[in-house]
Amino acid sequence: MAGNCGARGALSAHTLLFDLPPALLGELCAVLDSCDGALGWRGLAERLSSSWLDVRHIEKYVDQGKSGTRELLWSWAQKNKTIGDLLQVLQEMGHRRAIHLITNYGAVLSPSEKSYQEGGFPNILFKETANVTVDNVLIPEHNEKGILLKSSISFQNIIEGTRNFHKDFLIGEGEIFEVYRVEIQNLTYAVKLFKQEKKMQCKKHWKRFLSELEVLLLFHHPNILELAAYFTETEKFCLIYPYMRNGTLFDRLQCVGDTAPLPWHIRIGILIGISKAIHYLHNVQPCSVICGSISSANILLDDQFQPKLTDFAMAHFRSHLEHQSCTINMTSSSSKHLWYMPEEYIRQGKLSIKTDVYSFGIVIMEVLTGCRVVLDDPKHIQLRDLLRELMEKRGLDSCLSFLDKKVPPCPRNFSAKLFCLAGRCAATRAKLRPSMDEVLNTLESTQASLYFAEDPPTSLKSFRCPSPLFLENVPSIPVEDDESQNNNLLPSDEGLRIDRMTQKTPFECSQSEVMFLSLDKKPESKRNEEACNMPSSSCEESWFPKYIVPSQDLRPYKVNIDPSSEAPGHSCRSRPVESSCSSKFSWDEYEQYKKE
């Protein structure tokens, strides 16, 4: 659990129901069990149970003489619910006596019982949340003028700057927010106005408004969008943020408005910044924060392309117990982010810190490819499914063709590591996904490989063909030709080949294969003399004739070692050549080539 809250006055709105003191739990159960109808345990069950079948199970416990309220709260507590969640339900029930028990037990939850008797639904919840003490951090109590966070912004400035929220200043809209742009004191801000069109929907979405406000007030990080101010004036609830001129990461990846594509060094910087923010939220005390809505559209970029994580309406708190997850009810708002959510969330509503890791893995894939999460062609396939299928069937190199073509290519080592990391983050099983600590370390170590001009070849298959200019200047560069032409050497190269074939000491070559060469039968002294007089040369000059060009699918140079095919007076003598490359040699491929 998050901590021991047995002492009076140690409760807060974030205290888990598991940590509810036994004495308080007993009093609460006695009050609710003694009431009938909407104020009793049945009224509580109507709001906590997902189906009437669950209510029937509670009735069986009651028939056995057990407390229906205790069973309800125990089941609800397994979803990581807090005292603040319980207070909201009790307020909906209108159960002032139960609220009085909780608020009198932990005075820090509310300044007085009067706060639950005045005003409407939003005002009650706002006062309830605005006086919370978590980890010795006090959220200041709001007033009619709202809260100013190191800012001189007033609500009148908002009204005048937006002309009373005129549509001309509307720059975005979501399910529960409208976003306006406003100029105040030569500074630009974004105003998120809470929608209150319908009373029932207002009550439904109010908790999401509080969730975002709570996270922004309690937790601060350079890569989390800071809150400039918030107001609750005349039933207008709004959050004020600094305006991010470079928009969202999604818009920049898609080059919306014909903007220039992001170079690779900015992209890796964005990934590192967001991973730091997520890592901070997952490890913050007293309980970790699950974002629940990580996407490229929820990552904002400032003037210097520094990333800012935003949108915490779906955020949930959980204790730091290992392998713990909570179950939530999916809403229509979360369905917009389903492409970023793992299967355990879509099917069962399970939410954990590994959910954020999965979502971040999808963002990495977007950054690498510049593609949308769902590809229109072919057949609206998910980007994640396409890349993982390629990795499993054709290997990691097959994904490199999906790198964003709008920017110059990056080193293979850099992109391969990021594709591998994205695949691990977006694993189907949550246990196989890395922690954000591991993700952050991998990103920081990968950043250094971006500044290497190219990757050193590890085998002949990774060796790049030289340019034509290089071929003209170096006559000994191999040239491609058929096997049948290997014995028809050019006159100018015949002597050079004979000299090199008579060298006694083995060469050091970059090839991974071990070759056997036929040597001319000559007196030992003559061979030694020729070997000493021959000048040193590179491995390419030593092994390949002039007319063989290395390709990406280069096979071993075949040399006839059959004694019967040698000229009279020569014997077949073989010796291996040392290799400086540690890559594996495909014997199956060599045998197949030999048969041809």
Curated annotation (Swiss-Prot):
Q: Which tissues express it?
A: Expressed in eosinophils, dendritic cells and/or monocytes (at protein level). Expressed predominantly in peripheral blood lymphocytes.
Report the outcome of residue 134 to M.
Answer: Probable risk factor for ASRT5
Q: Which GO terms describe its molecular function?
A: ATP binding; magnesium ion binding; protein heterodimerization activity; protein homodimerization activity; protein kinase binding; protein serine/threonine kinase activity
Query: What does this protein's UniProt record list under function?
Result: Putative inactive protein kinase which regulates signaling downstream of immune receptors including IL1R and Toll-like receptors. Inhibits dissociation of IRAK1 and IRAK4 from the Toll-like receptor signaling complex by either inhibiting the phosphorylation of IRAK1 and IRAK4 or stabilizing the receptor complex. Upon IL33-induced lung inflammation, positively regulates expression of IL6, CSF3, CXCL2 and CCL5 mRNAs in dendritic cells.
Q: Which PROSITE patterns match?
A: DEATH_DOMAIN (PS50017), PROTEIN_KINASE_DOM (PS50011)
Q: Where exactly is the site Cis/trans isomerization of proline peptide bond?
A: 110-111
Q: Which InterPro entries match?
A: DEATH-like_dom_sf, Death_dom, IRAK3_death, IRAK3_PK, Kinase-like_dom_sf, Prot_kinase_dom
Domain (Protein kinase) spans: 165-452
The record's note on quaternary structure and interaction partners says: Monomer. Homodimer; disulfide-linked. May interact with IRAK4 (when phosphorylated). Interacts (when phosphorylated at Ser-110) with PIN1 (via WW domain) in response to IL33-mediated (but not TLR4 ligand LPS) dendritic cell stimulation.
Q: Does the keyword Lipid metabolism apply?
A: no
Which disease? Answer: Asthma-related traits 5: Asthma-related traits include clinical symptoms of asthma, such as coughing, wheezing, dyspnea, bronchial hyperresponsiveness as assessed by methacholine challenge test, serum IgE levels, atopy and atopic dermatitis.
Please tell me, according to the UniProt entry, what happens when changing residue 22 to L: Probable risk factor for ASRT5
State the name under which the record lists this protein. Interleukin-1 receptor-associated kinase 3
Query: Has keyword ATP-binding?
Result: yes
